[in-house]
């Protein structure tokens, strides 16, 4: 069974076909809620859309929402992705299994959404005081790694951040 996508390419329908093995700490969840949060121009919307598209290629149901707010003017915005093995009843994120925070305001402002066993992944250059919570936290200097390894800070930061998220999920 296949379906035609907006791009015109045929791909297996959701829930059919082989699924790649997932090995990260959140891989075995039937429903996974992720929030990407940061300031304007950090790529949080693009990261959410990219993760949602990747999850559909993994034959999973996906809901993706985003809030721009004042993010494009220096405030912070977010992109939420809900990934499930079953149809999604409610597309808005209520609690998060994974919070990806690219700035201090986002980490502080959204940490309360994390489930007790949740995971916080943050940019350790921009989040100098990670919020305390019961789950696990991983600080990664995404921007510095991107610049040192590739020489391009902005776009490569998005790729590195998504790579960390894919490994966890």
Model-inferred region functions:
Residues 2-169:
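Active-site cofactor/cluster-binding pocket
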């Amino acid at each position: 069974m296949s379906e035609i996508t907006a791009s015109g390419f045929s791909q297996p329908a959701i829930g059919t076909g082989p699924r790649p093995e997932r090995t990260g700490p959140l891989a075995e969840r039937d429903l996974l809620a992720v929030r990407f949060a940061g300031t304007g121009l950090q790529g949080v919307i693009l990261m959410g859309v990219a993760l949602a598209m990747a999850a559909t290629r993994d034959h999973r149901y996906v809901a993706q929402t985003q809030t721009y707010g004042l993010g494009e003017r220096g405030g912070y915005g977010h992109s939420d992705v809900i990934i499930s093995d079953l149809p999604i009843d409610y597309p808005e994120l209520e609690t998060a299994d994974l919070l990806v925070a690219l700035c201090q305001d986002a980490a502080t402002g959204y940490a309360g959404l994390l489930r007790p066993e949740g995971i916080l992944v943050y940019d350790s250059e921009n989040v100098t005081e990670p919020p305390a919570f019961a789950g696990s936290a991983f600080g990664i200097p995404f921007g510095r790694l991107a610049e040192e390894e590739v020489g391009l800070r902005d776009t490569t930061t998005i790729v590195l951040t998504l790579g960390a998220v894919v490994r966890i999920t």
